[in-house]
């Protein structure tokens, strides 16, 4: 078939316009507060990242930098809702580049600040293991409740015959959180069993703040863990997850798409006890091993040194380029959810 030069030019212009439109979305940003409930009176602060046509700008927020358009109008429809759960003592801003990438690709992202387990308030870590293990997934489910009922958002979130498209991403204790939403069940007695046997090889998990959550502080821990599965969640990504608490049987019962990322030099949550334990038990898991990466490779690099039980959160092993790796993750996460929902 012959195409005249003018038709070729028009076709190319159309392709360029389509490409420009595909990349036109920026990340909008706004902070919300989710009121307390009868069961849990503590409100939840969350940041929403969403696709918008407004121009984004680079803004420093504490030790992190975001590239967003604040309080601007969202697009009429979003591909789905993604809940983002930070690690213990973390922040709703610590994974902003991943949230921005998902928003630029059409998703509404709700990054919550876990009450009692964030950089300002670690009171949840002073409670029993049963309370800690229960509270985090329930907090994430409250965020889903709020946004699926919100008049501004409920009509924007894409749905199909299975219902609204909802996914979740979590890092570290956030990885635990999203796996619990997917159906993995924690068993408090596994903490003492694991640390009695493996403390020397998993020292940070067993010897820092989590040690206060020992089952010995909770005489009736196992019966206190209610079902945590949120059947609205249809795909999850667990980044360097805390996985040793989960039973193999419950991991084997997960029936939604799961991606697990392992930092191969992780000393905070040693992979063979956590990420790999999850990966060998979840059917059809998509496993990614990140060479030469430490535990905090999945977080944006802060502008200042932030100490942790495993050293400076801003530091990287020699030869590891966090910026390049996060760029890869910013492509892979939207692709994972696109595939899971379609």
Give residue ranges: language-model regions:
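Short substrate-entry loop that stabilizes the transition state in hydrolases
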Residues: 71-79, 84-122, 267-269
């Amino acid at each position: 078939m012959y195409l005249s030069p003018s038709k070729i030019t028009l076709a190319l212009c159309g392709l360029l316009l389509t490409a420009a439109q595909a990349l036109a979305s920026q990340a909008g940003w706004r902070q919300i507060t989710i009121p307390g409930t009868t069961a849990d009176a503590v409100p939840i602060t969350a940041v929403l990242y969403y696709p918008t046509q407004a121009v984004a700008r680079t803004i420093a927020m504490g030790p992190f930098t975001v590239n967003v358009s604040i309080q601007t109008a969202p697009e009429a429809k979003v591909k789905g809702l993604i809940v983002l759960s930070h690690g213990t003592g973390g922040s709703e801003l610590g994974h902003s580049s991943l949230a921005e990438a998902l928003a630029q690709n059409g998703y509404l992202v709700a990054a919550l600040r876990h009450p009692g387990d964030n950089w300002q308030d670690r009171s949840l870590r002073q409670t029993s293991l049963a309370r800690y293990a229960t509270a985090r997934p329930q907090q994430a489910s409250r965020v889903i409740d709020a946004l699926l009922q919100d008049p501004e958002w409920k009509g924007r979130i894409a749905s199909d015959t299975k219902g609204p498209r909802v996914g979740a991403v979590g890092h570290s204790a956030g990885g635990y959180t999203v796996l619990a939403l997917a159906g993995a069940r924690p068993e408090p007695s596994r903490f003492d069993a694991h640390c009695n046997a493996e403390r020397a090889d998993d020292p940070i998990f067993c010897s820092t703040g989590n040690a206060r959550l020992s089952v010995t502080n909770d005489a009736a821990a196992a019966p206190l863990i209610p079902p945590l599965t949120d059947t609205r969640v249809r795909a999850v990504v667990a980044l360097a997850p805390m996985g040793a608490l989960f039973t193999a049987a419950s991991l084997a019962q997960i029936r939604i798409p799961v991606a697990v990322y392992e930092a191969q030099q992780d000393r905070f949550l040693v992979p063979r006890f956590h990420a790999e334990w999850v990966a060998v038990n979840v059917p059809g898991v998509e496993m990614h091993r990140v060479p030469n990466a430490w535990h905090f490779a999945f977080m944006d690099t802060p502008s200042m040194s932030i100490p942790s039980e495993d050293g400076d959160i801003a530091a990287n092993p020699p030869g590891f380029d966090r910026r390049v790796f996060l760029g890869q993750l910013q492509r892979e996460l939207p692709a994972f959810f696109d595939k899971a929902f379609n």
